[in-house]
Amino acid sequence: MEPLPPLLLELCEAVLDQGGRAFLVGGWVRDLEMRRQQGLAGFPAAGEFDLEVYGLPADRLATLLGRFGEVKLVGQSFAVYKLVPRHAAGSGAAPAVDVSLPRRDTKVAPGHRGFEVQGDPSLSQQDATRRRDFTVNAMMFDPLEGKTIDLWGGRDDLSARLLRAVDPSTFIEDSLRVLRAVQFSARLDFAVEPATVELCRGIDLSDLPAERIWGEIEKLLLKAGRPSIGLDWASRLGVVDKLFPELKMLQGCPQEPEWHPEGDVWVHTLLAVDQAKREIDGLPIEKALTVMLAVICHDFGKPSTTALVDGRIRSYEHEEAGVLPARAFLDRMNIRTLHGYDVREQVVQLVAHHLTPSHYFKNRDNVGDGAFRRLARRLEPDLLYRVSRADCLGRTGDFSTEAQEWFIGRVRDLSVQSRPPAPILMGRHLLEMGLPPGPAIGRITRAIYELQLDGRIRNLEEARREARRLLNEDEVNTS
Protein backbone atom coordinates (compact mmCIF):
# COMPACT_ATOMS: atom_id res chain seq x y z
CA MET A 1 0.00 0.00 0.00
CA GLU A 2 1.46 3.34 -1.12
CA PRO A 3 0.38 6.28 1.08
CA LEU A 4 0.26 9.76 -0.35
CA PRO A 5 3.47 11.67 0.45
CA PRO A 6 3.02 13.92 3.49
CA LEU A 7 4.43 16.84 1.53
CA LEU A 8 1.65 16.51 -1.03
CA LEU A 9 -1.00 16.69 1.67
CA GLU A 10 0.75 19.65 3.31
CA LEU A 11 0.84 21.42 -0.04
CA CYS A 12 -2.89 20.85 -0.60
CA GLU A 13 -3.64 22.16 2.91
CA ALA A 14 -1.52 25.26 2.25
CA VAL A 15 -3.46 25.91 -0.96
CA LEU A 16 -6.73 25.53 0.96
CA ASP A 17 -5.52 27.99 3.62
CA GLN A 18 -4.91 30.53 0.83
CA GLY A 19 -8.47 30.11 -0.45
CA GLY A 20 -7.75 27.68 -3.28
CA ARG A 21 -8.28 23.98 -4.00
CA ALA A 22 -5.73 21.46 -5.27
CA PHE A 23 -6.58 18.24 -7.10
CA LEU A 24 -4.50 15.39 -8.45
CA VAL A 25 -5.15 14.86 -12.16
CA GLY A 26 -4.00 12.66 -15.02
CA GLY A 27 -2.93 9.05 -15.20
CA TRP A 28 -2.47 8.63 -11.46
CA VAL A 29 -6.19 9.17 -10.87
CA ARG A 30 -7.05 6.72 -13.65
CA ASP A 31 -4.74 4.12 -12.15
CA LEU A 32 -6.24 4.71 -8.69
CA GLU A 33 -9.76 4.06 -9.97
CA MET A 34 -8.59 0.97 -11.84
CA ARG A 35 -7.11 -0.36 -8.60
CA ARG A 36 -10.33 0.33 -6.74
CA GLN A 37 -12.39 -1.48 -9.37
CA GLN A 38 -10.05 -4.44 -8.99
CA GLY A 39 -10.62 -4.42 -5.23
CA LEU A 40 -7.06 -3.29 -4.44
CA ALA A 41 -6.43 -1.06 -1.44
CA GLY A 42 -4.04 1.86 -1.27
CA PHE A 43 -2.74 4.28 -3.86
CA PRO A 44 -0.76 3.58 -7.03
CA ALA A 45 2.95 4.31 -6.94
CA ALA A 46 4.08 7.44 -8.75
CA GLY A 47 7.41 8.84 -9.78
CA GLU A 48 5.75 12.22 -10.19
CA PHE A 49 2.39 13.78 -9.35
CA ASP A 50 0.31 16.23 -11.40
CA LEU A 51 -1.53 18.76 -9.25
CA GLU A 52 -4.04 21.28 -10.61
CA VAL A 53 -4.73 24.32 -8.43
CA TYR A 54 -7.96 26.34 -8.59
CA GLY A 55 -8.61 29.75 -7.06
CA LEU A 56 -5.03 31.05 -6.74
CA PRO A 57 -3.39 33.38 -9.28
CA ALA A 58 -0.02 32.37 -10.66
CA ASP A 59 2.09 34.76 -8.56
CA ARG A 60 0.57 33.66 -5.26
CA LEU A 61 0.86 30.00 -6.28
CA ALA A 62 4.55 30.40 -7.11
CA THR A 63 5.23 32.08 -3.77
CA LEU A 64 3.41 29.32 -1.90
CA LEU A 65 5.29 26.56 -3.73
CA GLY A 66 8.61 28.17 -2.83
CA ARG A 67 8.00 27.26 0.80
CA PHE A 68 8.20 23.55 -0.07
CA GLY A 69 11.24 23.31 -2.32
CA GLU A 70 12.85 24.43 -5.54
CA VAL A 71 10.34 25.76 -8.07
CA LYS A 72 11.00 25.72 -11.81
CA LEU A 73 8.68 27.50 -14.24
CA VAL A 74 8.02 25.05 -17.08
CA GLY A 75 5.29 26.89 -18.99
CA GLN A 76 5.04 30.62 -18.38
CA SER A 77 1.86 31.47 -20.30
CA PHE A 78 -0.12 28.61 -18.78
CA ALA A 79 1.59 28.61 -15.36
CA VAL A 80 3.09 25.16 -14.99
CA TYR A 81 5.60 24.72 -12.19
CA LYS A 82 7.80 21.80 -11.30
CA LEU A 83 8.26 21.52 -7.55
CA VAL A 84 11.36 19.59 -6.49
CA PRO A 85 10.95 19.00 -2.75
CA ARG A 86 13.87 19.75 -0.44
CA HIS A 87 16.01 16.70 0.32
CA ALA A 88 14.49 14.99 -2.75
CA ALA A 89 17.49 12.72 -3.03
CA GLY A 90 17.05 11.32 0.47
CA SER A 91 15.55 8.02 1.49
CA GLY A 92 11.76 8.07 1.32
CA ALA A 93 11.78 11.53 -0.25
CA ALA A 94 8.63 12.84 -1.90
CA PRO A 95 8.61 12.66 -5.70
CA ALA A 96 8.56 15.79 -7.80
CA VAL A 97 5.20 17.49 -8.33
CA ASP A 98 4.06 19.24 -11.50
CA VAL A 99 1.73 22.02 -10.38
CA SER A 100 -0.43 23.93 -12.83
CA LEU A 101 -3.40 26.23 -13.08
CA PRO A 102 -6.45 25.05 -15.02
CA ARG A 103 -5.82 25.78 -18.69
CA ARG A 104 -7.97 27.57 -21.21
CA ASP A 105 -7.15 26.39 -24.75
CA THR A 106 -7.99 28.56 -27.74
CA LYS A 107 -7.56 27.15 -31.23
CA VAL A 108 -5.73 29.82 -33.25
CA ALA A 109 -4.21 27.81 -36.11
CA PRO A 110 -4.52 24.39 -37.74
CA GLY A 111 -2.61 21.41 -36.47
CA HIS A 112 -1.33 19.90 -33.26
CA ARG A 113 0.54 23.05 -32.21
CA GLY A 114 -2.09 25.60 -33.19
CA PHE A 115 -3.25 26.45 -29.67
CA GLU A 116 -3.01 29.50 -27.45
CA VAL A 117 -2.97 28.23 -23.88
CA GLN A 118 -3.53 30.41 -20.81
CA GLY A 119 -3.66 29.47 -17.16
CA ASP A 120 -6.97 30.53 -15.61
CA PRO A 121 -7.45 29.88 -11.87
CA SER A 122 -11.13 30.89 -12.11
CA LEU A 123 -11.99 28.18 -14.65
CA SER A 124 -14.65 25.71 -13.53
CA GLN A 125 -13.76 22.06 -13.05
CA GLN A 126 -16.07 21.10 -15.90
CA ASP A 127 -14.49 23.53 -18.36
CA ALA A 128 -10.98 22.55 -17.26
CA THR A 129 -11.54 18.81 -17.63
CA ARG A 130 -13.42 19.27 -20.91
CA ARG A 131 -10.11 19.84 -22.71
CA ARG A 132 -8.72 16.41 -21.75
CA ASP A 133 -8.54 13.63 -24.30
CA PHE A 134 -10.42 10.64 -22.86
CA THR A 135 -12.95 10.33 -20.07
CA VAL A 136 -10.71 7.92 -18.16
CA ASN A 137 -8.03 10.63 -18.09
CA ALA A 138 -10.41 13.44 -17.11
CA MET A 139 -11.03 12.46 -13.48
CA MET A 140 -9.69 14.45 -10.52
CA PHE A 141 -8.82 13.37 -6.98
CA ASP A 142 -9.09 15.52 -3.87
CA PRO A 143 -6.23 14.39 -1.58
CA LEU A 144 -7.71 16.12 1.47
CA GLU A 145 -11.15 14.54 1.19
CA GLY A 146 -10.01 11.30 -0.44
CA LYS A 147 -12.66 11.60 -3.15
CA THR A 148 -12.53 11.23 -6.92
CA ILE A 149 -14.41 13.79 -9.00
CA ASP A 150 -15.73 12.24 -12.21
CA LEU A 151 -17.65 14.71 -14.38
CA TRP A 152 -17.51 12.79 -17.68
CA GLY A 153 -18.27 9.15 -16.85
CA GLY A 154 -14.67 8.02 -16.60
CA ARG A 155 -15.44 5.34 -14.02
CA ASP A 156 -18.09 3.78 -16.25
CA ASP A 157 -15.68 3.71 -19.18
CA LEU A 158 -13.01 2.13 -17.00
CA SER A 159 -15.49 -0.60 -16.12
CA ALA A 160 -16.37 -1.05 -19.79
CA ARG A 161 -12.67 -0.86 -20.76
CA LEU A 162 -13.35 1.91 -23.26
CA LEU A 163 -11.48 4.96 -24.51
CA ARG A 164 -14.09 7.66 -25.16
CA ALA A 165 -13.44 11.26 -26.20
CA VAL A 166 -14.47 13.75 -23.52
CA ASP A 167 -15.76 16.41 -25.91
CA PRO A 168 -15.87 15.68 -29.66
CA SER A 169 -15.57 19.37 -30.53
CA THR A 170 -12.27 19.80 -28.68
CA PHE A 171 -10.96 16.27 -29.29
CA ILE A 172 -10.63 16.79 -33.04
CA GLU A 173 -8.57 19.96 -32.58
CA ASP A 174 -5.46 18.01 -31.50
CA SER A 175 -4.27 15.35 -33.95
CA LEU A 176 -1.87 13.84 -31.41
CA ARG A 177 -4.87 12.40 -29.60
CA VAL A 178 -5.25 9.78 -32.32
CA LEU A 179 -1.81 8.42 -31.48
CA ARG A 180 -2.59 8.67 -27.79
CA ALA A 181 -5.59 6.44 -28.46
CA VAL A 182 -3.23 3.96 -30.10
CA GLN A 183 -0.81 3.74 -27.19
CA PHE A 184 -3.45 3.85 -24.44
CA SER A 185 -5.46 1.09 -26.12
CA ALA A 186 -2.44 -1.18 -25.80
CA ARG A 187 -1.25 -0.01 -22.37
CA LEU A 188 -4.68 -0.41 -20.82
CA ASP A 189 -5.96 -3.16 -23.14
CA PHE A 190 -9.02 -1.02 -23.86
CA ALA A 191 -11.17 -0.74 -26.97
CA VAL A 192 -11.84 2.62 -28.59
CA GLU A 193 -15.50 3.60 -28.37
CA PRO A 194 -17.16 3.58 -31.85
CA ALA A 195 -17.95 7.30 -32.04
CA THR A 196 -14.37 8.07 -30.98
CA VAL A 197 -13.12 5.72 -33.71
CA GLU A 198 -14.96 7.81 -36.29
CA LEU A 199 -13.54 11.02 -34.81
CA CYS A 200 -10.01 9.61 -35.03
CA ARG A 201 -10.42 8.38 -38.59
CA GLY A 202 -11.48 11.85 -39.70
CA ILE A 203 -8.50 13.72 -38.23
CA ASP A 204 -5.66 14.84 -40.51
CA LEU A 205 -2.32 13.65 -39.11
CA SER A 206 -0.02 15.39 -41.58
CA ASP A 207 0.77 18.21 -39.14
CA LEU A 208 2.31 15.92 -36.51
CA PRO A 209 6.05 16.45 -35.99
CA ALA A 210 8.24 13.36 -36.19
CA GLU A 211 9.29 13.62 -32.55
CA ARG A 212 5.67 13.63 -31.32
CA ILE A 213 4.82 10.59 -33.43
CA TRP A 214 7.83 8.76 -32.04
CA GLY A 215 6.99 9.84 -28.49
CA GLU A 216 3.69 7.97 -28.63
CA ILE A 217 5.10 4.94 -30.47
CA GLU A 218 7.91 4.71 -27.91
CA LYS A 219 5.35 4.60 -25.09
CA LEU A 220 3.44 1.92 -26.99
CA LEU A 221 6.53 -0.26 -27.36
CA LEU A 222 7.85 0.18 -23.82
CA LYS A 223 4.73 0.46 -21.67
CA ALA A 224 2.27 -1.94 -23.31
CA GLY A 225 2.31 -5.60 -22.39
CA ARG A 226 1.03 -6.43 -25.88
CA PRO A 227 2.05 -3.72 -28.37
CA SER A 228 0.12 -5.56 -31.09
CA ILE A 229 -3.10 -4.21 -29.60
CA GLY A 230 -1.94 -0.67 -30.34
CA LEU A 231 -0.72 -1.55 -33.83
CA ASP A 232 -4.08 -3.14 -34.57
CA TRP A 233 -5.86 0.02 -33.41
CA ALA A 234 -3.40 2.10 -35.43
CA SER A 235 -4.76 0.29 -38.46
CA ARG A 236 -8.40 0.67 -37.42
CA LEU A 237 -8.02 4.39 -36.63
CA GLY A 238 -6.36 5.20 -39.96
CA VAL A 239 -2.89 5.84 -38.54
CA VAL A 240 -1.27 3.09 -40.61
CA ASP A 241 -2.89 4.39 -43.81
CA LYS A 242 -1.84 7.97 -43.13
CA LEU A 243 1.60 7.65 -41.56
CA PHE A 244 3.14 4.23 -42.12
CA PRO A 245 2.96 2.90 -45.71
CA GLU A 246 5.57 0.26 -44.83
CA LEU A 247 3.14 -1.28 -42.34
CA LYS A 248 0.23 -0.95 -44.75
CA MET A 249 2.12 -3.02 -47.35
CA LEU A 250 2.31 -5.95 -44.90
CA GLN A 251 -1.47 -6.27 -44.80
CA GLY A 252 -2.60 -8.91 -47.26
CA CYS A 253 0.94 -9.97 -48.18
CA PRO A 254 0.69 -13.79 -48.22
CA GLN A 255 3.08 -16.27 -46.63
CA GLU A 256 3.67 -19.99 -47.12
CA PRO A 257 1.20 -21.72 -44.75
CA GLU A 258 3.70 -24.44 -43.84
CA TRP A 259 5.93 -21.86 -42.18
CA HIS A 260 3.35 -19.22 -41.35
CA PRO A 261 0.00 -20.82 -40.54
CA GLU A 262 -1.05 -17.63 -38.73
CA GLY A 263 -1.74 -15.75 -41.98
CA ASP A 264 -0.27 -12.76 -43.78
CA VAL A 265 2.83 -10.75 -42.93
CA TRP A 266 0.83 -8.22 -40.90
CA VAL A 267 -0.59 -10.91 -38.63
CA HIS A 268 2.88 -12.42 -38.23
CA THR A 269 4.36 -9.02 -37.36
CA LEU A 270 1.73 -8.44 -34.66
CA LEU A 271 2.48 -11.82 -33.10
CA ALA A 272 6.22 -11.24 -33.38
CA VAL A 273 6.16 -7.81 -31.74
CA ASP A 274 4.33 -9.24 -28.73
CA GLN A 275 6.94 -11.99 -28.52
CA ALA A 276 9.66 -9.36 -28.80
CA LYS A 277 8.29 -7.70 -25.67
CA ARG A 278 9.08 -10.95 -23.83
CA GLU A 279 12.61 -10.98 -25.24
CA ILE A 280 13.82 -7.59 -23.98
CA ASP A 281 13.99 -8.21 -20.24
CA GLY A 282 17.18 -6.82 -18.75
CA LEU A 283 18.06 -4.60 -21.71
CA PRO A 284 18.65 -0.86 -21.38
CA ILE A 285 15.95 1.26 -23.00
CA GLU A 286 17.92 2.00 -26.16
CA LYS A 287 18.57 -1.67 -26.87
CA ALA A 288 15.04 -2.72 -25.91
CA LEU A 289 13.66 -0.22 -28.42
CA THR A 290 16.16 -1.44 -31.01
CA VAL A 291 14.84 -5.00 -30.71
CA MET A 292 11.21 -3.88 -30.82
CA LEU A 293 11.74 -1.69 -33.88
CA ALA A 294 13.76 -4.37 -35.65
CA VAL A 295 10.96 -6.88 -35.16
CA ILE A 296 8.39 -4.41 -36.50
CA CYS A 297 10.59 -3.82 -39.57
CA HIS A 298 12.02 -7.31 -40.06
CA ASP A 299 9.72 -8.36 -42.92
CA PHE A 300 9.39 -5.01 -44.69
CA GLY A 301 11.10 -6.64 -47.68
CA LYS A 302 8.44 -9.30 -48.20
CA PRO A 303 5.86 -7.26 -50.14
CA SER A 304 8.39 -6.52 -52.89
CA THR A 305 9.87 -10.04 -53.05
CA THR A 306 6.93 -12.38 -52.48
CA ALA A 307 6.10 -14.61 -55.45
CA LEU A 308 4.59 -18.00 -56.21
CA VAL A 309 7.43 -20.38 -57.13
CA ASP A 310 6.63 -23.98 -58.04
CA GLY A 311 3.31 -23.71 -56.28
CA ARG A 312 4.73 -22.32 -53.03
CA ILE A 313 4.89 -18.77 -51.67
CA ARG A 314 8.48 -17.54 -51.52
CA SER A 315 10.12 -14.25 -50.58
CA TYR A 316 13.74 -14.73 -51.58
CA GLU A 317 16.23 -12.11 -50.34
CA HIS A 318 13.54 -10.23 -48.45
CA GLU A 319 16.03 -9.47 -45.67
CA GLU A 320 18.12 -7.13 -47.85
CA ALA A 321 15.00 -5.80 -49.59
CA GLY A 322 13.75 -4.65 -46.20
CA VAL A 323 16.63 -2.26 -45.60
CA LEU A 324 15.33 0.73 -47.59
CA PRO A 325 11.76 0.61 -46.24
CA ALA A 326 13.15 0.16 -42.72
CA ARG A 327 15.25 3.31 -43.15
CA ALA A 328 12.20 5.19 -44.45
CA PHE A 329 10.09 4.03 -41.49
CA LEU A 330 12.74 5.11 -38.98
CA ASP A 331 13.35 8.41 -40.75
CA ARG A 332 9.65 9.25 -40.61
CA MET A 333 9.97 9.36 -36.83
CA ASN A 334 13.49 10.81 -36.93
CA ILE A 335 14.88 7.83 -35.03
CA ARG A 336 18.67 8.16 -34.88
CA THR A 337 20.59 7.73 -31.65
CA LEU A 338 19.40 7.30 -28.08
CA HIS A 339 21.74 7.73 -25.11
CA GLY A 340 24.63 7.70 -27.59
CA TYR A 341 23.54 4.38 -29.09
CA ASP A 342 22.97 4.23 -32.86
CA VAL A 343 19.48 2.75 -32.82
CA ARG A 344 18.86 3.45 -36.50
CA GLU A 345 21.90 1.64 -37.86
CA GLN A 346 21.52 -1.27 -35.48
CA VAL A 347 17.87 -1.76 -36.51
CA VAL A 348 18.81 -1.69 -40.19
CA GLN A 349 21.53 -4.30 -39.68
CA LEU A 350 19.20 -6.52 -37.66
CA VAL A 351 16.63 -6.36 -40.46
CA ALA A 352 19.26 -7.23 -43.06
CA HIS A 353 20.52 -10.21 -41.05
CA HIS A 354 17.42 -11.45 -39.23
CA LEU A 355 17.64 -14.89 -40.89
CA THR A 356 21.37 -15.30 -40.20
CA PRO A 357 20.94 -17.47 -37.06
CA SER A 358 18.87 -19.94 -39.08
CA HIS A 359 21.29 -19.84 -42.01
CA TYR A 360 24.27 -20.44 -39.74
CA PHE A 361 22.49 -23.32 -38.03
CA LYS A 362 21.63 -25.03 -41.30
CA ASN A 363 25.29 -24.79 -42.34
CA ARG A 364 26.74 -25.26 -38.86
CA ASP A 365 29.34 -27.81 -39.98
CA ASN A 366 30.87 -25.20 -42.28
CA VAL A 367 30.40 -22.00 -40.25
CA GLY A 368 33.61 -21.10 -38.45
CA ASP A 369 34.25 -18.83 -35.50
CA GLY A 370 35.31 -16.08 -37.87
CA ALA A 371 31.77 -15.77 -39.23
CA PHE A 372 30.44 -14.96 -35.75
CA ARG A 373 33.24 -12.52 -35.00
CA ARG A 374 32.72 -10.70 -38.30
CA LEU A 375 28.98 -10.59 -37.75
CA ALA A 376 29.64 -8.83 -34.44
CA ARG A 377 31.36 -6.03 -36.38
CA ARG A 378 28.03 -5.20 -38.03
CA LEU A 379 25.53 -5.71 -35.21
CA GLU A 380 25.08 -7.02 -31.68
CA PRO A 381 24.60 -10.80 -31.93
CA ASP A 382 22.73 -10.87 -28.62
CA LEU A 383 20.12 -8.50 -30.05
CA LEU A 384 19.97 -10.54 -33.25
CA TYR A 385 19.26 -13.63 -31.15
CA ARG A 386 16.31 -11.86 -29.51
CA VAL A 387 14.95 -10.62 -32.84
CA SER A 388 15.30 -14.08 -34.36
CA ARG A 389 13.50 -15.71 -31.42
CA ALA A 390 10.64 -13.22 -31.76
CA ASP A 391 10.44 -13.96 -35.48
CA CYS A 392 10.43 -17.71 -34.88
CA LEU A 393 7.91 -17.70 -32.03
CA GLY A 394 5.71 -15.00 -33.54
CA ARG A 395 3.69 -17.64 -35.33
CA THR A 396 0.90 -20.05 -34.56
CA GLY A 397 1.94 -23.66 -34.38
CA ASP A 398 4.76 -25.44 -32.60
CA PHE A 399 8.10 -24.18 -33.94
CA SER A 400 11.48 -24.97 -32.41
CA THR A 401 14.03 -22.33 -31.43
CA GLU A 402 16.89 -24.84 -31.70
CA ALA A 403 18.63 -22.68 -34.30
CA GLN A 404 18.46 -19.57 -32.12
CA GLU A 405 19.71 -21.37 -29.01
CA TRP A 406 22.59 -22.91 -30.95
CA PHE A 407 23.43 -19.47 -32.34
CA ILE A 408 23.54 -17.69 -28.98
CA GLY A 409 25.52 -20.57 -27.50
CA ARG A 410 28.25 -20.06 -30.07
CA VAL A 411 28.09 -16.30 -29.58
CA ARG A 412 28.57 -16.65 -25.83
CA ASP A 413 31.37 -19.16 -26.22
CA LEU A 414 33.22 -16.58 -28.33
CA SER A 415 32.28 -13.64 -26.05
CA VAL A 416 30.92 -11.57 -28.94
CA GLN A 417 27.44 -10.87 -27.57
CA SER A 418 27.69 -7.12 -28.06
CA ARG A 419 30.93 -6.39 -29.87
CA PRO A 420 33.72 -8.05 -31.85
CA PRO A 421 37.05 -8.91 -30.24
CA ALA A 422 39.38 -5.99 -29.63
CA PRO A 423 42.36 -6.02 -32.01
CA ILE A 424 45.41 -7.65 -30.48
CA LEU A 425 47.90 -5.79 -32.67
CA MET A 426 47.76 -2.00 -32.59
CA GLY A 427 49.63 0.59 -34.58
CA ARG A 428 51.83 1.39 -31.59
CA HIS A 429 53.11 -2.17 -31.60
CA LEU A 430 54.31 -1.76 -35.19
CA LEU A 431 55.96 1.55 -34.31
CA GLU A 432 57.75 -0.23 -31.46
CA MET A 433 58.97 -2.77 -34.01
CA GLY A 434 60.58 0.04 -35.99
CA LEU A 435 58.02 0.50 -38.75
CA PRO A 436 57.78 4.20 -39.68
CA PRO A 437 54.40 5.96 -39.69
CA GLY A 438 52.54 5.51 -42.96
CA PRO A 439 49.86 3.55 -44.80
CA ALA A 440 51.65 0.25 -44.18
CA ILE A 441 50.63 0.40 -40.51
CA GLY A 442 46.93 0.43 -41.33
CA ARG A 443 47.29 -2.26 -43.97
CA ILE A 444 49.19 -4.64 -41.69
CA THR A 445 46.98 -4.11 -38.63
CA ARG A 446 43.92 -4.83 -40.78
CA ALA A 447 45.50 -7.99 -42.19
CA ILE A 448 46.46 -9.22 -38.72
CA TYR A 449 42.96 -8.47 -37.42
CA GLU A 450 41.40 -10.59 -40.15
CA LEU A 451 43.64 -13.47 -39.11
CA GLN A 452 42.65 -12.85 -35.49
CA LEU A 453 38.96 -13.05 -36.38
CA ASP A 454 39.60 -16.42 -38.01
CA GLY A 455 41.33 -17.63 -34.86
CA ARG A 456 44.75 -17.90 -36.51
CA ILE A 457 46.21 -15.17 -34.27
CA ARG A 458 45.59 -15.66 -30.56
CA ASN A 459 48.10 -13.45 -28.76
CA LEU A 460 50.45 -10.51 -29.23
CA GLU A 461 53.50 -12.71 -29.82
CA GLU A 462 51.80 -14.47 -32.73
CA ALA A 463 50.57 -11.12 -34.06
CA ARG A 464 54.08 -9.64 -34.03
CA ARG A 465 55.51 -12.74 -35.68
CA GLU A 466 52.95 -12.55 -38.49
CA ALA A 467 53.51 -8.80 -38.87
CA ARG A 468 57.26 -9.41 -39.35
CA ARG A 469 56.49 -12.03 -41.96
CA LEU A 470 54.24 -9.60 -43.85
CA LEU A 471 56.90 -6.90 -43.64
CA ASN A 472 59.51 -9.28 -45.01
CA GLU A 473 57.17 -10.18 -47.87
CA ASP A 474 56.77 -6.48 -48.65
CA GLU A 475 60.54 -6.04 -48.75
CA VAL A 476 60.96 -9.00 -51.09
CA ASN A 477 58.16 -7.80 -53.38
CA THR A 478 59.58 -4.28 -53.61
CA SER A 479 63.25 -5.25 -54.05
PLM regions with names:
Residues 1-479:
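Catalytic cores of the polymerase beta-like nucleotidyltransferase superfamily
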